[in-house]
Amino acid sequence: MTYARIAKSSRYLSEFAVSNDDLSQIMETSDEWIKTRTGISSRRISQQENTSDLAIQVAKQLLAGEDPAGVDLIIVATMSPDAYTPATAALVQAAVGAENAACFDLSAACSGFVYALDVAEKMLRRPGGMALVIGAETLSKLVDWQDRTTAVLFGDGAGGVLVKNDALEPHFLASQLKSYGHLAKFLSAGQTSPQPFPGPVTDLAPFKMNGREVYKFATHKVPEVITACLEEAGVGLAEVDLFLLHQANYRIVKQVARRLDLPEEKFPCNIAEYGNTSAASEAILLAELAEEGKAQAGDLVVLAGFGGGLTAAAQLVRL
């Protein structure tokens, strides 16, 4: 019997960076105001690229040296797809020539990558099989650029992993996927009209968030799902090498570390440079750490997300 493992990670971000000072030219804000509240200094904005373009770049990097025909599954976690249909994953499939892959998008907002990784691990049962799990977002197309409470938070980007079913021992050790639909009103984007014939299709509703309620939710529920995940695996908090949290707000990450009574050094952050990239953030962070040699084979890692739904998720993996 063989088991699934993360064989490779990758990321892709536009080179076009927008600083806090740049934003202060178009809205009432400042570098100090943004950094103090979020830890964000800059974010990447994709000017001429769709979500699928970012995901395709990641997929091509992940499949370098691999046979695309051997890919069984492609999941793209996103809340900003190119279109309602076709799925972004189908566009990725066509671009990389993975003609044998089942393809679909998964929408769980900023928990999406952790959700998708868990789904892929459970679906990938063929020995030697491969899956692409990608988080990709172009949230710059969804935010209201006159609303400083949300526009300053988000950036565009993509990250992903190649999952292979070829390990001789389990690498995906436990997971917790939670949803709290009664809290849905606190974070929303892209609503369509409830009327059947409202006239021509217009722009989707912009991103809206009750920041205070989301902060309270994240700082309470993320420690809960992480603790439950580790209890399921029989692993202690101190045994984990890295906690890769959704990069929404530096203050949230610090507070989660504090609630778990763990050193902040175990909770790396790159939000200062990239902002909140939603479903892409954990994958981007993992790929960046792997490139720097800070996340290595054998490391015990928790991936955790939280976001719209509201949702919270944690996955314990051995790299």
Swiss-Prot record:
GO terms for molecular function: 3-oxoacyl-[acyl-carrier-protein] synthase activity; beta-ketoacyl-acyl-carrier-protein synthase III activity. InterPro entries: ACP_syn_III_C, ACP_syn_III_N, FabH, Thiolase-like. The keyword NAD does not apply. It comes from the Bacteria. It catalyses: malonyl-[ACP] + acetyl-CoA + H(+) = 3-oxobutanoyl-[ACP] + CO2 + CoA. Pathway: Lipid metabolism; fatty acid biosynthesis. One of its GO terms (biological process) is fatty acid biosynthetic process. It is found in: Cytoplasm. It holds the Pfam family ACP_syn_III. GO terms for cellular component: cytoplasm. The active site is at residues 110, 246, 276. Its main location: cytoplasm. It is an enzyme of class 2 (transferase). Residues 247-251 are annotated as: ACP-binding. Its EC number is 2.3.1.180. Catalyzes the condensation reaction of fatty acid synthesis by the addition to an acyl acceptor of two carbons from malonyl-ACP. Catalyzes the first condensation reaction which initiates fatty acid synthesis and may therefore play a role in governing the total rate of fatty acid production. Possesses both acetoacetyl-ACP synthase and acetyl transacylase activities. Its substrate specificity determines the biosynthesis of branched-chain and/or straight-chain of fatty acids. Homodimer. The last Arg residue of the ACP-binding site is essential for the weak association between ACP/AcpP and FabH. Belongs to the thiolase-like superfamily. FabH family. This is Beta-ketoacyl-[acyl-carrier-protein] synthase III. It comes from Lactobacillus delbrueckii subsp. bulgaricus (strain ATCC 11842 / DSM 20081 / BCRC 10696 / JCM 1002 / NBRC 13953 / NCIMB 11778 / NCTC 12712 / WDCM 00102 / Lb 14). The lineage of its organism: Bacteria, Bacillati, Bacillota, Bacilli, Lactobacillales. The gene is fabH.
